Amino acid sequence: MVNTVEVFEYSNKPDDVLFNVRFSQVAVNKGNYILKNSAAISRIYEYIEPVNGIPQGNYEPVIQLIAPIKTQVATFLGKYNPTEKTAIDFEIGVSNNDKNLFSSQDDSNNEGLATKINAKQRLFSKKWNVDAFANYQFIAKDFSSVERLYSIEFSRDWNLGTTAIGNQSYLVSGLQMTLPEKGSLVYQFEKLDFSGNFSGNRHILNALFNLNHWKIQSQGSFLNSDATSSTSKFLRNQTQVKYHFKKNWIGTRLRLEDNQEKNKTTNEFSALSQRFSEYGFFAGRGDSTKVFVELGYFKRANDSLQNGIIQRVNNSQTFALRSKLIQTNKSDLSLFVNYRVLDFVDATKKNEPSLNSRMIYNDRFFNQLIQSTTVFETNSGSIPQQEFTYLEVPVGQGVYTWND
């Protein structure tokens, strides 16, 4: 007891009356406990007396109750092909997301609407097929989906962060040129707007060609965005050229990123800003779907924010081995090895060599009734110690489960 207030104190004495207490983090000056020691196996919390009736901590010995929720989504689909060269389809979705079935407060924003329309028109059909396409999506701010609407990289593609709010409008349009059995070239213009605080556009150019013994792949994009507090430009490209002859191949690869985000008020780069470029060569022999071996060499330059300027931090050289040594109906053996030397621009830092490898062996017995997998890994270099905190969310909304 502290001034007639019952408090909990950490103790490991077996003679004391012990309680299993769980603490939850609350807002600053809303709790009476602070986190005193997080290095121990069990976190230690300390009671701090209020000052003039104002709590001085940000933890409380309470467990938040999770209210039952309900999410419903109804969709209506349609399709119309006025001619052989024209295709139109649409989708309308309505959602009802009640975050607390025990309460009627704030029920006015439970319902939301989303629409999507696609159109494609064949412009030219001879040696080359040329198609124009457009896709428009509108998602009201209160619309809730059961599953993820976009890829996990969507936010990074647009430098959205966690600030995008309001109704969403997303337009995709472009041209696709296809050379039958040879390849295709696609140009896209994308426009994304959030009514609250974001507007951006992206230019995308993708190519894939198989010409005689040559295989060419390229993916490139350029983003220009304007948010409430920042602007950004984001350039990316990944290109690979490979030449096949008999059971052998040689190739080269280029990857680069240049992401520059600036604060509107200070005109300074944000911590998101970074840049890298990587190029290399590789050669292999065999069948990449069966037994093969491939050797590669790659050189990379990394630039990051230093003293308010994006500048060179380190360079690296990587020697890589990819292989599948055994491939049968009953077993397969794969081996991957990477040796990297990291060279820092800062002369006070030593070069960091690292060797990482993985060998995977799969075997199947009794007509695949029994299957076994053996994995052997080696790692060198240092990995910083990390601590993770997990918060319980309603069933179906998390990606981790409690297992003890």
Give residue spans per PLM region.
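Surface-exposed, low-hydrophobicity segments enriched in Gly/Pro/acidic/Ser residues
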Residues: M1-D404
